[in-house]
Regions:
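Membrane-embedded alpha-helical segments that form the functional core of polytopic membrane enzymes
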Residues: 39-80, 88, 112-116, 129-140, ...
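Transmembrane alpha-helical segments that form the membrane-embedded catalytic/substrate-channel core
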Residues: 66-74, 136-144, 185-202, 235, ...
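Multi-pass membrane catalytic core of lipid/isoprenoid biosynthesis enzymes
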Residues: 80, 88-129, 218-242
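Intramembrane alpha-helical segments
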Residues: 101-171
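Structural signature of hydrophobic alpha-helical transmembrane segments
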Residues: 119-133, 186, 249-258, 299
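Interfacial loop-to-transmembrane junctions
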Residues: 219-222, 263-291
C-alpha cells in the first residue's frame, strides 16, 4: 500500500522562472546598443533644446527604446542560424532555445511597431520617419548584406547613427547642420569600434559565413587602413559642434584630447594587429563616445 501511494503521488510541474524569462527578453533587446541609442538621443535632444521639455523628452526616450529593443530582437530572429555557429552568440536566447523564434518575432514586431506609433503620436512625424528609416536600414539592408559583402559595416553605420538625429528632430521638427554634425561624429565612431570587434572575433565570423573585412583580408591591411582613416577623420569632425557654436572651449579641448587618445589606440591596432591591441581599441571606443556626449551636454552654449 505504501509503495502504491508513492506511485500515485503527483509530480509537481517545474516552476516557471520569470526572472530567467526577463533576462532573456533583456538580452533579446540588445541592451548595449539600446544604451548607446538612448544616450545619443538624449544628448541631441538636450543640445537642440532652448527650453527643456521633460515630458517630450520622456516620450522620445520611451519611443526610441521600444524601436531599438524591437530592432535588436528582429535582428536576432533573422540571424538565429548564424548566431548558433558563433561562440560569442551561441548562448543568446534564440540559438540556445530558451526563447522560441515565434516569441522573438512577436516581441520584436510589437516593440518596433509600438515604438514607431508611439513616436508618431507623442513626438512628431519626422522623428517617427527617422525611426522607420533606422529599422528599415538595420533589418532590411544591413542585416542581409552582412552575409554578402564587407561593405555592410559601412552601410550599417548609417542606420546606426540615426538615433542622434531623432533627438534633434523631436525638439526642432527639422534637421539643420548641427544635427548632421552630430550624425557624422557617430557615423565615423562606429567603423573603428566595429572593426575592433570584427578583428577579435574574425574566426567566429568566418565560421558563420560573414565575409567581413577582417575575414576576407586575414592579414588585416585593409582593416588597418579603414581603422586609421575613420578614427583620424573623427578628430576634426568632432570639433564641428564648437565651430557651429553649439559648444564652448571646454568641449573643443576635450574632444581634441579624446580624439588624439582614440587615434593612438587606432594606430597601435592598425600597426600591431593583435587581439590585445584590438581589445584596447574597443575599450578606447567604448570610453570615447559617452565621454564626448557628456562634454557636448555640459558645455552646451
Amino acid at each position: 500500500m505504501e509503495s502504491t501511494a508513492r506511485l500515485e503521488t503527483p509530480i509537481a510541474p517545474p516552476s516557471f522562472d520569470w526572472r530567467q524569462l526577463l533576462r532573456d527578453f533583456y538580452d533579446l533587446s540588445k541592451p548595449g546598443i539600446g544604451f548607446y541609442s538612448l544616450l545619443t538621443t538624449a544628448t541631441s535632444f538636450w543640445l537642440a533644446s532652448t527650453v527643456f521639455h521633460p515630458v517630450l523628452f520622456l516620450h522620445t526616450l520611451i519611443a526610441t527604446g521600444l524601436v531599438t529593443c524591437g530592432g535588436g530582437a528582429l535582428n536576432q530572429v533573422i540571424e538565429i542560424e548564424a548566431d548558433s555557429q558563433m561562440r560569442r552568440t551561441e548562448k543568446r536566447p534564440l540559438p540556445s532555445g530558451r526563447v522560441s523564434p515565434l516569441t522573438g518575432l512577436l516581441f520584436g514586431v510589437l516593440s518596433a511597431a509600438g515604438g514607431v506609433l508611439y513616436m508618431l503620436l507623442f513626438v512628431n512625424g519626422l522623428a517617427s520617419l527617422l525611426a522607420i528609416l533606422t529599422l528599415g536600414g538595420y533589418l532590411f539592408v544591413y542585416t542581409p548584406l552582412k552575409k554578402k559583402t564587407h561593405l555592410a559595416t559601412l552601410i550599417g553605420a548609417f542606420p546606426g547613427a540615426v538615433p542622434i538625429l531623432i533627438g534633434w528632430a523631436a525638439v526642432r521638427g527639422s534637421l539643420g547642420p548641427e544635427a548632421w554634425a552630430l550624425f557624422a561624429i557617430l557615423f565615423l565612431w562606429q567603423i573603428p569600434h566595429f572593426l575592433a570587434i570584427a578583428w577579435m572575433y574574425r574566426k567566429d565570423y568566418a565560421r558563420a559565413g560573414f565575409p567581413l573585412l577582417t575575414v576576407i583580408d586575414p592579414e588585416g591591411n585593409r582593416s588597418a587602413l579603414q581603422i586609421l582613416n575613420y578614427t583620424l577623420a573623427l578628430v576634426p569632425v568632432s570639433l564641428l559642434p564648437t565651430l557651429l557654436h553649439m559648444t564652448g572651449a571646454i568641449y573643443f579641448g576635450g574632444a581634441l584630447l579624446l580624439g588624439l587618445g582614440f587615434g593612438v589606440a587606432a594606430i597601435r591596432a592598425a600597426t600591431q594587429r593583435t587581439n590585445t591591441t584590438a581589445k584596447q581599441l574597443l575599450y578606447a571606443s567604448i570610453i570615447y563616445l559617452p565621454v564626448i556626449l557628456v562634454l557636448l551636454a555640459v558645455n552646451k552654449i
